[in-house]
Amino acid sequence: TVESELKLGLLGTAPTALYRHATGTGHLFARSNWTRDALWMGFVAGRYDQSHAHQDQGAFTLFQRDFLAVTENIFTHSGIQQGAEVHNVVRFTSNGTTVRQREGTTSTMVVTPGANGALTVDADLTPSYNGNAAVGQWRRRLDFNASRLRVHDTFTIGAGVQATFQVNTPVQPFVNGRTATAGSLLVTVIEPADATLSVLDWRTQGSSEYTRGWRLDIRGSGNAFVVELAEAGALFGNGFD
């Protein structure tokens, strides 16, 4: 069958392109190579113009042989959880309430390819908050290569607003200082130096809706996050044991 031939790699040569930036929808898809063991990333920064669309501007997905980091929405009963809480973004909260991204806005990203599948992304997610004083600015830079994704966030926020870097995972994260391991995913917080990491079991938010999944929450002082995400085996294979 075609499916079997695809799995066996019998349908000709692999494409040369390693990323696709769909500018009309604001979606980026990138992979480190065309082997089964490739590190794959998805990212969103573009038009938010549908009432049923998700508040996922600035969200990333990471995959290597299986999902490493992915929206919690895929593990819900309804499949229609749209809030920022279920996506891999910086979540801004004011008085305990998540600051919403707004329909009718357009975020932007600039993609710069490098060698051997590496690329950088510079995204301005500020427009998605439509002038809300709670979020004066949010920019996200991604540095992607065959072994890891580095995420660098800078932001300005209003008084009383808290920023949380969040990573939704299919398996439970275990925290050790400023690192966390969730199955094959290793998360390392580089900034802020005083970062605290905590874990949410989504089933505690209603097991009839949230059937599985966890969220790693990273908080700290300052107006920036720098976080690296990698497949742990790749790091160990390079001698980081």
Stretches found by the model and what they are:
Residues 235-240:
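Ser/Thr-rich, Pro/Gly/Ala-heavy low-complexity intrinsically disordered linkers and tails
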Residues 1-69, 214, 219-220:
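Carbohydrate-active enzyme catalytic cores, enriched for enzymes
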Residues 74-233:
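CBM-like, beta-strand-rich accessory domains located in the C-terminal region of large
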